[in-house]
């Protein structure tokens, strides 16, 4: 091997260290919040119990984002390094690649892995199904915990009014309830944000696949318009009276959402099984337009549903604050 080739190989390897450094810096942002994860339930372990399932559902939902960013960072480093011939150029390329990696990396990874159109369309649908199933599980477990905390909060107030617990004891328990509810809020927001990011991935895939066939990108309903329409239908966040009526209302809502989320997850699992059966028979669509319609009909609702669950959690916290203030134990 010539000396020039040795130096070229060293330079290339030096460039390739950069994307991995960037991904290592990105990883903490995808991890659960340490302060929340260190929470040790002293009074309500039964309400904390679903959190393990909640965390797993969230991890399943976000795992593909980091992989896509990694692919983008690697390709960006190569392009940047080749274009400029130095480490700085590779670093800039890796950074840009990481930001766009979830979009470009996803599409190109699919096309590299699946040359057959039907197999690739099935793969897109499989990803959508996995995202929808995990999102439904996140909502199901979140609403289970929310219901538990609401029930315990109501019991706490009753005991305090009867003089069975001191103000200090009640506040300690109330603090744990709010910590758990805050954790639920963070999980729901993180999961919803990932689905919104995936929306960009899928739309990019639809457009790219259409371009390869010299066809216009399929028209897909706007996610933002769907979210705006849902927001207009939400109940008022204002809490009237002592908050007890609102607590009953949101608890009922949470139960409805929990049941529906479980049904949605089961529905997706059946769809996944049907897709596997179709794949074994070498059936399925090769049309990106068909896949985009499937996406529009089902996936967008998953984003809105998580946003609705966020709203229920926020309204529950607001009602708790009002009820606690009326009882004389408010701390926030």
What are these regions (language model features)?
Residues 54-115:
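Short, low-complexity, glycine-enriched hydrophobic/amphipathic alpha-helices that associate
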Residues 9, 31-65, 106-332:
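Helix-termini ("caps") and immediately adjacent flexible loops/tails
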